[in-house]
Amino acid sequence: MSLPTLIILYGPDGVGKSTQIDILAKQLTADGHTVKKVWLRGPHTMAFLLSRILIKAGRTRHLSNPFGRVKTLPDIGTNPLIKQLWALTEFVSVLPLLVIRVILPLKLGYHVLADRYVLDVVVSTAFYINDPNFIRHKISNILMGFIPTSSVLIHLDADYDTLIKRRGNLVEPESFIDFQKNGYALLSQRVPTHYIDTSKLTVDETSEAIQGILRNCKG
């Protein structure tokens, strides 16, 4: 089996995704592979503009991390139709990005390394509309369909204390991290994933764990 053409790293901020994507890109390039790095999360374009409008209008909710740093989010409210509209807006916004940044490069023979992908879009959207059930929504199912069966998905994780040490006052609020982790756990039941807890691993040890997964996938 050849090297997977789409390699996806996902997980909370602070687990080392970007660092590992950079290391992997250098390794694959040195081995003669043509590589493209991508990043997807949300909100995108129209959904982002809508969030700015709601925040400007004072429709907000606030979360804070242990350092008192406040994360301001649009308050979508509880109206199911508005939640559906937000989710649909995000879907329409991210669709062309998926085609341009991922699908076309794959068709052109690139190895695409995704620092976040549709799993993160689904979880992010669910969080913005404050609805964990969105993870089972038909829009989520369509987004998950953009994961080719030959892809390798690697969930990088770390406990919250480790994230605090790594991110300092930039660490995301714990409630947001908990929401992400619960969402990832649900999505991992739908697609084959590999899990690495980076809490007690060095950068090199995490890289070697990723390389081991890819070696096994190549057969």
Where are these regions (language model features)?
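Hydrophobic anchor at the beta1->P-loop junction of P-loop NTPases
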Residues: 9
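Hydrophobic positions on the alpha1 helix immediately C-terminal to the Walker A/P-loop
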Residues: 20
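Short beta-strand-centered segment that lines the nucleotide-binding/catalytic pocket of NTP-utilizing
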Residues: 31-47
